[in-house]
């Protein structure tokens, strides 16, 4: 029995021992946990707002006790050290605002809570504190019509002249007559100038800006919260004079505030048109983006949206013009050895430009190597001139070198030599070889044919040698050859045997009074048969003087063309003839191409005596003279055919009087010269055509405008008729509906009338029955 109990008691004792050990461990752990300090009780989490938000919430809820506790808690006490620059903590709590700048006093006025208003004012709140839009508590009370709050604020020093951001006083926001009367009475009592109060901010800004300009420094004054500059404020409120001063002082029109707004954004948002124009003129960007990616057009008021679009187009046009001018200014200029500035741009036709280009190409290889050419007057007295410079080029067109304005010019000897540099250079630059240039000053100098259809006579061998570069002169043993200048057409000298050259008089033709030429330059002097190719001297005159001189030259060039009496006398002196035979020159023809009628008179006996043998003056001689002159002028258009014409002319001249008479008889009716050879006349004709075309277009535009107005009126009438026609079915339907309603109403009234007659009959029957009953009752009562 004892043996069986032993094994059974062993497992039970082991389990008990294990439990005892576990119990001991728990006891020891509890002892250690009790000895160590515990974490304590966990505090509940709370949400704390800013003191300003809590104070605003307490005042909005009317909890004045809580507001007093907050103000008392904000007071640091008598011994605390305070920052002198910062407001007291209690005052900061009283004037605390929300995101819109609304303080507790603003909110109390909005809620019409006079008790909270009194509490805040008694505690020291700022009565004239403005929100983000510039509204004071008095603005709020006036706008809401709270008379009691307005009186209380006025009695405690509220500013009745305060102006908000829109430029409004509390009086401007008054809604009721009682409020308006209260504010007007207060304004009269205080003597406030309403207009001056509205201009006070602008005057202050203007004064500060002038002080900045006088001081020479422009401070970067910015709003501490919004970052707006003075230009932002002036643009938003339309202070144009302040903006002009700021922009003239160098204020950047692209300044940005805290939101990335430029002054143009502000002006567009508030709809200030003048400010938008001024900023756009000073480079305000129409495509400037804010931090939100908005342009001025995106923020603009509807009234200024069209203006901004127009300003954007103008800025784009100005930008394109500036880029085009810069690109033109960067084009390479053709090199020129002459540094003299051109006084004006040559007005040449396309044909003349091509001839000038060809001439400049032919002149370049040997133009600078040959000896210089002098004028006849200068060749006798003055020294050798320096070699000519290369002609200046403008857009690929060679232009003649400009003579120096400082060179001495004698008006008595050469009346038109002052303007000789204005002659067009067609072929006069291509000179013959040096050995062909003979001594100047030969006797017998005559008049040459100038650019204005004047007659000049050739007198020396030098005049014969001045020809186009491709012309080979045909020597004539008897007759001098006519000189050919640059596209200047002239007739050959008079046909004579041994006498000095004389001029064949030309009768005045009624169909063609003026012989057209290919040049518009003034006539050359009788002695200046060739151009002076001297080196131009640099002109030191100013730009304005140069332009004025060029204008005078152009005017004189138009008004002094023709041959005067002085030219004729000098030509006669040079030819050795007496001036007694010449008649006084008549007044110039008032046409575009002037001429001297006295010179063309062919009835003079002196001129008839001067004519060579067998060649008396008459219509045939004049026509032959013009024909020969036209043949001489013909090769000026194409230089290839000139040698053959020259040789043919020489053979004709050498044939004697009979050949000349046959030629005259064959060419009695020469073809008129085309007026297209005369650039000046062509310009005049073109101008007249353009003017007529403009008049025609203007009349057409006027007619079109009137027609458009008539069509608009007709369209409006048609639209009105269509609207009436469109509304007519609706009107008919409405009338039909009303008719049916009236019919129904009439039927109802008829039914009512029938019922009324029945009711009357019933009523009468009841009356009769009632009378019968009354009689029965009266009988029964007896």
Curated annotation (Swiss-Prot):
Task: Give the matching SMART domains.
Answer: ANK
* Phosphothreonine modifications at: 560
Tissue localization of expression is: Ubiquitously expressed. Highly expressed in heart.
**Which compartments is it annotated to reside in?**
Cytoplasm; Cytoplasm, Cytoskeleton, Stress fiber
ANK repeat positions: 100-129, 133-162, 226-255, 259-288
Listed Acidic residues bias regions: 374-383, 670-680
GO term, biological process aspect, one:
signal transduction
What are the UniProt keywords, alphabetically?
Answer: Acetylation, ANK repeat, Coiled coil, Cytoplasm, Cytoskeleton, Phosphoprotein, Repeat
**SUPFAM superfamilies to which the protein is assigned, alphabetical:** Ankyrin repeat
State what protein this is by name: Protein phosphatase 1 regulatory subunit 12C
